[in-house]
Amino acid sequence: FPDELKSFFLVSESDGYAHIYHYDYDGNLLNQVTKGDFEVIGIDALDLKKKKIYFTSTEGSSTERHLYVAKFDGSSKKRLTPEPGQHSVSVSPDGKYYLDSYSNVSTPRQVEMWTTKGKMIEKMVDNQSVLEFIEKTAYAAKELFSFTASDGQKLDGYYIKPIDFDPGKSYP
């Protein structure tokens, strides 16, 4: 609770999804920062000078986690992590940089240092040896899919076909 802010941010599910709310110290709601059919995973950093909040959310896909930045009033929201996948980030105290550790179904863990203006500074871990091993080895990749359940809820999943998959053959 920074003294100069005179307010605080809270992640709450009061609208049915986990979203960020901005309150004054008397408990009065100033504004709802995020809205929509997605979940905010957590608040990563505040830039008090620029009045920006950095947060991780599932916006776009429930199977992914991305870093976003928005103004305290919720405007000017922008996704910062460019690659698809599950991102785990650490934002610098001044809000200028972030360390991004991510992977997805076709990319082993990558670790990169970025500016919050969108410039990659350094790829620290690329797992090139893992990528080379996958290319040389008989490997069945995961395939993502989604469907709508009987209650209308969208569900995501993946399947792995046999390496020698034959679409004309029947499988158990």
Regions found by a protein language model. Give the residues of each.
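Alpha/beta-hydrolase fold active-site loops
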Residues: 170-172
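Beta-propeller blade-edge and WD-like acidic-aromatic loop motif
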Residues: 6-7, 13-32, 58-79, 103-125
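Short coil/turn segments that connect the beta-strands within blades of beta-propeller domains
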Residues: 5-6, 50-51, 94-96
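Short coil-to-beta transitions that initiate beta-strands within beta-rich domains
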Residues: 1-4, 38-49
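Non-catalytic accessory segments flanking enzyme active sites
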Residues: 11, 42-46, 56, 77-166
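Short intrinsically disordered, low-complexity coil segments enriched in acidic
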Residues: 1-9, 167
